[in-house]
Amino acid sequence: AKNESFIEFAKSLCKIAINCSSIEELLSSEYESMNVSEKLIEQTGVIGEKLEIGSFELINSEYVGFYIHAGNKIGTLVGLSNKFEGSEELSKNIAMQVAAMNPIALNQDGVSKDIIEKEIEIAKEQLRAEGKPEAMLDNIAKGKLKKFFKESTLINQAYIKDNKSSVYDYVKSVNQDCEITDFKRVALV
């Protein structure tokens, strides 16, 4: 559903959602003479496709920027620790990074223990298959885990627009006092 009616309806829902803290609150919010849930049902008849809100993402930060990828299939939000001249461009660039590189966490502290253990085990299995001595596996696996964090955590990823600096370094080059506080990525499959 990409017709003008749907796009306008989606934009109006976004304006309501920005003041909500949960999907339940959004669905029960007033929309014209009914609530959002009822409006979704009504619009299903108007647009001709079933409409539902599949997810609701919230970031509490001093500044939140966004990016909608071409084709409207990926949307990202990025929270910054402060608002300043240039925060809109910075947050959009980082949100584009999130859309393109799909990081699993902000930093290595955000990576679950299960994923870390799985990555270490995968690394050890690869090393065993290569015939590496068992005594060396732990140290080599730690190095592979560092590489995994560099590729999979947002602040450690290579910044896609220059591929020279990390996302962290890019943020600091724009504003020394700014930090990325959170990000969300939603994709239609």
Residue map of PLM features:
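N-terminal assembly/interaction segments in proteins that build large macromolecular machines
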Residues: A1-V189
